[in-house]
Amino acid sequence: MVNNSVATTGFVETKEMRIKRRTSLRKQVFKSWQLYLMLILPVAYLLLFSYYPMYGIQIAFRDYTPSMGMTGSEWVGIQHFVNFVNSQIFWDLFKNTIIISLYSLLCSFPLSVVLALCLNVVRVEKFKKVVQTVTYIPHFFSIVIIVGMMFQIFNPHMGIFKHVVELFAGEGAAVPDLMGKGEAFYHTYVWSAIWQNLGFNSIIYIAALSSVDTELYESAQIDGASRFKIMLHIDIPTILPTIVIMLILRSGHILSVGYEKALLMQNDANIKYSQLISTYVYNEGLMKGFKQYSSATAINLFNSIINFICIWSVNQFSKKVGESSLW
């Protein structure tokens, strides 16, 4: 058997070689012990908050009650998944979540790339810094502040939006209540999120553009290339791998629309449009107590499975048509 292995591979690792490899690994760890020490906290964080909670996934397949514990609760299989998919509200939740997610992706993703390309063109550093500061600051506002600002701005009686409408349509013109109009929920939700995160999302593309060799710009200018052609043939190809990777990552959150903002914007007028999977999980798992805890866990697991399928599919497609992929 050993001779066949040697004949096939042409190489057999001896005991001395294994000891030497282990010694070499210890030397590398000892040489860079500071870096390995810095890894302790992030690894501990992942183990504690990402991997350890996976033990609780079994709640999705049980009729969980606190008195019985996770392992003692009755096993019901995929019953909670079936109940959710067959519920009357399922397709409304799924539709609203998909619409907001795709709407946000199609609008915010290209706009952040465009902003990065435009800022890269600006040569006046003071103006560039002012624009960056103005676009970055909203990202650090809490959701509560953002929604509060929206209610003040779009107030049909005394908001800024009212004055803008009257400026163009005349005083006394009818002002729509955007925060109380169901059909407007998608637009107000998505565009307020774009305003809040546009600058911050462009940072990674600005960083990628900083790696472009300045000699390429000089050569293109000598050849008489316009600024648009430079952007088309130098800037975009440079950040294209970054764009693909970020798109793949975003596809893994296709159903992960946060519940906080939707709940704060939610009212009786837009409830049909603002009910998302995340808000439903919040109401089932936290507002109704342990009675619906298993159902909420099952819905969250369903959400994660769909997200994984999306990110895997997009990654495989990217791998076939291009060179960039996550794995």
Put a short name on every predicted segment.
Residues 1-28:
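Short, Lys/Arg-rich, polar N-terminal cytosolic tail immediately upstream
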Residues 28-327:
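A structural signal for multi-pass alpha-helical bundles of membrane permease subunits
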